[in-house]
Amino acid sequence: MKIFISIASYQDLLLPITINSAYTNAKFKENLRFGIIDQCKVKLDFSKAKLKDQISYVHIDPKDARGPCWARANAQTLLQDEEYFLQVDSHTVFEKDWDEYLIQYIQTLKKYSKNPVISAYPRGFEIVDFEKKVFRKLQEEDHSTHVMVLDREKTFKDGYFSMQKGLPSASKEIYKGFLISAGFLFSESKMIED
């Protein structure tokens, strides 16, 4: 089961780290394929990377960038025959065996919904040492599910980009939601085709 990983990046120095984190922490590395729209001054070179054949990479000068939605739409055009679609921000750190977990979770959700989508705000992390690629996960002791909700304090107020936030929930129930995060979105690829 192949997973297409869609990444739209705008001058993000963490993009190579995100790609490496997804690849090294995947259980089935051979089933990953990356579609990357990199809006950055410096073009990345994957010619010597062991995953070079698993990357479709488009470099765009940042002065020609047209925003995150445009870049994400372009990344989606790189989708081929992969069964699953994962869209993440270009500054994401992955957990061990994340690929197996997400596929199993989607299969569980299919018992309740025909076309499930997993979406969330990923847990934050801080950069301890960028040169040595040392990061520390925030909220590491918090194993609860964070449910996306509208933030009443920010809804429709000037100066706020997002009106959503994640709230911890101890519930193990599966709930249908109405909010989506473009920074982490996983589903079957037919969602993009539809």
Please provide the spans of the model-predicted regions.
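Catalytic cores of eukaryotic secretory-pathway lumenal/extracellular enzymes that build
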Residues: 1-194
